Amino acid sequence: SEASTDFLALSDRLVELDEKGANIERLLTAGVGINAEGGEFLEIIKKMIFQGKPFSPENKEHMVIELGDLMWYVAQACMALEVSFDDVVARNVKKLEARYPGGAFDVYYSENRAEGDL
């Protein structure tokens, strides 16, 4: 897109999103932070699985700390979207209940979703 290759187009797009109430600064902070912190969390797991690091109290504490950082960015996303964390979880539960009749995971339904199932 033009906004991805031209600074003025990007600037115009950011203004447009701001005028629509997108709270783009907080959304971008949240999106970048969730991915960065998720990567740090996964890095610890990767080292335990593939590089012989132990599942030790220190590594567990490190994961908890990274998870806390990740949760802070999730909170930023919730604030940007003006939705509570509890509402996000409730919506996810409702989505999964609709996707998996009977409440049990099924590979078929995970790969063959109904129309509108995000």
Q: What does each model-identified segment do?
A:
Residues 1-118:
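Flexible "arm" and connector segments at domain edges
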